[in-house]
């Protein structure tokens, strides 16, 4: 059952006690039904990634947020430390997950807006992500290569995106690298 709108939503920092609910959000949000070409898939990759980022100490806790709907964790956004030219000078957004039954009612957008505000308040110069080129530009994201930040793999520039924040300064450029948990996904 999909809801048409949400009556009451609270965005807050994630707490240690939210870990199981956050995992459940990502498992559900990234699950794919079986098709003729592929078997069903749980969102274990994204859920494990969030768990690994947390275990490695690479999450930026002030920016990792949950959305509660009627007291239940229904969405989550992870923000982790990222590197440019091997310096930990940026943060990366993702995964961003929302329970399927409350998708398309503004929870993901609210989480993105709130986490961008939190990153800006912390003095982060920019937020980088690998994401859908028609969803993220509404939040001010554009190709990272336009700002001198190059992706770690051969992703199209329309998918590797950056949003400058108030602390952005000239001279920040070079090859981008995610936290180690992202790099282990390729293993």
Which residues does each PLM region occupy?
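A conserved beta-turn-beta hairpin within the catalytic core of GNAT-like acetyltransferases
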Residues: 82-93, 103
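Conserved active-site alpha-helix within GNAT-family acetyltransferase domains
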Residues: 121-125, 130-156
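Short, Lys/Arg-enriched N-terminal segments with co-localized hydrophobic residues
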Residues: 1-8
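A short beta-loop-alpha structural element at the N-terminal edge
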Residues: 10-24
